[in-house]
Amino acid sequence: MNKPRKGDLRVWWIPQVPMKSFFVPVGNLHEAKLILDTLADYDMFQLKNNIKPDFSNAGGLQVFNGDDWYTWYNHEGNDFDTVADLLDSE
């Protein structure tokens, strides 16, 4: 994996809390929403089809600030969950 650059985005996902998270680099907010929705749908599919008895997942979007990864917020201070709802209406 290439060294991250300032402004790079990545999705983080924990399929079963308290497991470690894994990360998926994304190019924009639409890609992030697609990945997060797909991972959530996959977990729900596994539950509904008795592949796993239950789950407690978590996920989100991070941005690299040049030194470390931080939770992504837009310029108005909204988190990704709030902004993702707006992406559906575009």
Model-derived regions, located:
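Short acidic/polar mixed-charge low-complexity motifs
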Residues: 18-20, 67-68
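A short, exposed loop/beta-hairpin motif centered on an aromatic-Gly-Thr core
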Residues: 19-30
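A structural detector for beta-sheet-dominated domains
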Residues: 12-14, 25-27, 64
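Short aromatic-glycine-(Arg/Gly/Cys) micro-motifs in beta-strand/loop hairpins
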Residues: 3-19
